[in-house]
């Protein structure tokens, strides 16, 4: 961290030191390969000398038996805990009193006061007062740690100085989301696909990836059982892992009221790096684009997947009134020009008056003429009051054999 001192006097009796606390790393092993069946034994002898010099008993492992302290100021990532040790040292030959230390962390949007217990302390010559402070980083970008010290000299003079320590905070993961609305599902289910990419320069192990839904939805995680178990949760730098969630309406009796809801919930993630450092992130509220159903919505409730050619089959449909007024609806069937499927049901049938947020069921008899995968099209719903026609094509596909 780069420091920038600022003081009210050039001659200070106290000195301020700040040190970031980070976990050590495993020391790498400079392995020496040799032929274990060398009849001369020279390779084994040379490998033994290398082990004697390096103090490592095993040369066949990628990491050693010893830990090393960080050799440089490593990156700080969003969601991690920033821990540092702040120490006030009396470098003079006099005792100072009323020593108070204040630590603040300033970002581009706010200034946070960090808890510090060094208050009204008395520090004798060559003595010190310090404290370990931890803070969860919640913003990316430039951060400034501001440490201010107030104290009194033996002559009763009030002294003050402060130091600034600047460091950047990067984003450890990148989250991309996609929403899929099951418009043919009467339950108004919504599927969320989340792609998580490790944008840091270190390996991470995903401990938890959960969706915290809004009050309007219940969530189910659609997780694939990885044949490698927890190995699938290990993300190397630039690795991407996908997660899928299904959200169903909490109020199953009023599913049509969910068509305009856009707030889905928040994605909650936690992970650990190679030495066990923990990180946690929660996204902002996820928003989806509400599907445009119009005033009416048609769904296929029941239909066979395969049928025999020239053998009629039945398709069960359900029509929803998504508007805020009652609709007087009429069903009309248009025979397709290709004549692969032919409607056998009467056209121009009245479906009656449909109140808001209600539905009506009806069935269609269809005669398959041509083999292959055929689409059901040509269903027309007419609002007899406004004379508006709602066209429904390709509502289902049938395999004709």
Curated annotation (Swiss-Prot):
One of its GO terms (cellular component) is TRAPPIII protein complex. This is Probable trafficking protein particle complex subunit 13 homolog. PANTHER family: TRAFFICKING PROTEIN PARTICLE COMPLEX SUBUNIT 13 (PTHR13134:SF3). Belongs to the TRAPPC13 family. It comes from the Eukaryota. It comes from Caenorhabditis elegans.
């Amino acid at each position: 961290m780069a420091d920038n001192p600022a003081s009210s006097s050039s001659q200070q009796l106290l000195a301020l030191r700040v040190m970031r606390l980070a976990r050590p790393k495993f020391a790498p092993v400079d392995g020496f390969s040799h032929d274990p069946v060398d009849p001369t034994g020279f390779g084994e002898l040379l490998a033994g000398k290398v082990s004697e010099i390096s103090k490592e008993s095993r040369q066949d492992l990628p990491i050693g038996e010893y830990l090393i302290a960080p050799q440089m100021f490593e990156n700080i990532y969003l969601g991690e805990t920033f821990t540092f040790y702040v120490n006030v040292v009396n470098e003079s030959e006099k005792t100072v009193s009323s020593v108070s230390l204040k630590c603040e962390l300033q970002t581009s949007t706010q200034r946070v006061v960090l808890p510090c217990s060094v208050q009204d302390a008395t520090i004798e010559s060559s003595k010190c007062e310090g404290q370990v402070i931890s803070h969860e980083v919640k913003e990316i970008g430039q951060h400034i740690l501001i440490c201010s010290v107030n104290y009194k000299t033996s002559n009763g003079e009030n002294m003050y100085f402060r130091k600034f320590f600047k460091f950047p905070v990067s984003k450890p993961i990148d989250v991309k989301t996609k929403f899929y609305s099951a418009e043919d599902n009467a339950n108004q289910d919504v599927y969320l696909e989340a792609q998580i990419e490790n944008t840091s320069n270190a390996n991470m192990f995903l401990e938890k990836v959960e969706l915290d839904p809004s009050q309007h939805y219940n969530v189910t995680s659609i997780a694939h059982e990885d044949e490698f178990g927890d190995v699938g949760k290990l993300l190397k730098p630039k690795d991407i892992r996908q997660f899928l969630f299904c959200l169903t309406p909490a109020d199953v009796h009023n599913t049509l009221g969910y068509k305009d809801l856009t707030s889905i919930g928040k994605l909650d993630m936690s992970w650990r790096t190679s030495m066990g450092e923990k990180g946690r992130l929660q996204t902002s509220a996820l928003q989806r684009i509400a599907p445009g159903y119009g005033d009416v919505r048609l769904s296929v409730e029941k239909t066979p997947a395969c049928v025999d050619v020239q053998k009629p089959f039945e398709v069960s449909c359900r029509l929803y009134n998504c508007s805020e007024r009652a609709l007087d609806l009429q069903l009309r069937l248009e025979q397709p020009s290709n004549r692969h499927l032919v409607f056998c049901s009467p056209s121009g049938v009245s479906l009656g008056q449909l109140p808001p947020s209600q539905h009506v069921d009806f069935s269609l008899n269809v005669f398959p003429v041509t083999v292959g995968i055929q689409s059901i099209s040509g269903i027309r719903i007419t609002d007899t009051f406004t004379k508006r026609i709602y066209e429904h094509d390709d509502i289902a596909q049938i395999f004709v054999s």
